[in-house]
A protein has these predicted regions:
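Active-site loop-to-helix "anion-binding N-cap" substructures in soluble metabolic enzymes
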Residues: 1-189
Length: 191
C-alpha cells in the first residue's frame, strides 16, 4: 500500500514533488512561448495547495518534451512556473538548473508555504539513463535537498526514471492527491 499525502509530516519540510507538467506549447505572434492546454498544471494544484497549507516548502520536479539530456531553451519550465504562479495566486520561484547550485539556492530560499520549480529534469541525461546507478546518482543529489518525496505525476508514475523511482527509494514518500484520485478510479474498473 502506498502512503497517502495525509500520512506525511510536511510542516517546515522541503517536499520534492514530482508533477506531470508535460503540456503542449506554441508561440504567439511575438515569438513568446505559450501553453495551449494547462490541464496538467491545474491538476497538480490541489496537491500543491494541500502541502503549502500544511507549511511545506514545495520544490517541483517535472519534465517538458524530450530534450534528450540537453538544455533546450524552448522546453524550459519557466512558462509553466509562470502559469502555476497565476493558478496558485502566489509567486513561484524558478531554478536555472536541474540539481546544481541554482536548484540548491532556490530550495534553500523557500519559506514555509512557498513553491519553487526546478528546471526540466530531462535536461540532465541521468534522469532517463538506462543505468540505475546513474539515475540514483541524480536522485541522491535531489534527496540531499529535500526531506520527503511526493509523487503526483500520474502520467509518469510508470517510468523508470530518477525523479520517479530512484527518488522515492531515498526519502519518505507518498502519493499526491492526483495519483490517489487516479488510482481510485482505476480500482473501480472491472476488466
Amino acid at each position: 500500500m502506498v502512503a497517502r499525502l495525509a500520512d506525511l509530516d510536511v510542516a517546515g519540510k522541503v517536499v520534492l514533488l514530482r508533477a506531470d507538467f508535460n503540456v503542449p506549447l506554441d508561440t504567439d505572434a511575438d515569438g513568446a512561448t505559450i501553453i495551449t492546454d494547462d490541464r496538467r498544471i491545474r491538476s497538480s494544484v490541489p496537491t500543491i495547495k494541500a502541502l503549502t497549507d500544511r507549511g511545506a516548502r514545495v520544490a517541483i520536479l517535472a519534465h517538458l518534451g524530450r530534450p534528450k539530456g540537453e538544455v533546450v531553451a524552448r522546453l524550459s519550465l519557466r512558462p509553466v512556473a509562470a502559469r502555476l504562479s497565476e493558478l496558485l495566486g502566489q509567486p513561484v520561484a524558478v531554478a536555472d538548473d536541474v540539481c546544481g547550485p541554482s536548484a540548491a539556492a532556490t530550495i534553500a530560499s523557500l519559506s514555509d508555504g512557498q513553491v519553487a520549480v526546478l528546471e526540466n529534469v530531462r535536461f540532465d541525461p541521468r534522469e532517463t539513463s538506462k543505468d540505475p546507478d546513474v539515475r540514483t546518482e541524480l536522485a541522491s543529489q535531489w534527496a540531499a535537498m529535500g526531506d520527503v518525496f511526493v509523487s503526483d505525476g500520474f502520467g509518469v508514475v510508470h517510468r523508470n526514471q530518477a525523479s520517479v523511482t530512484e527518488l522515492a527509494a531515498l526519502l519518505p514518500h507518498a502519493a499526491g492527491l492526483l495519483v490517489e484520485k487516479e488510482a481510485h478510479v482505476l480500482s473501480l474498473i472491472h476488466i
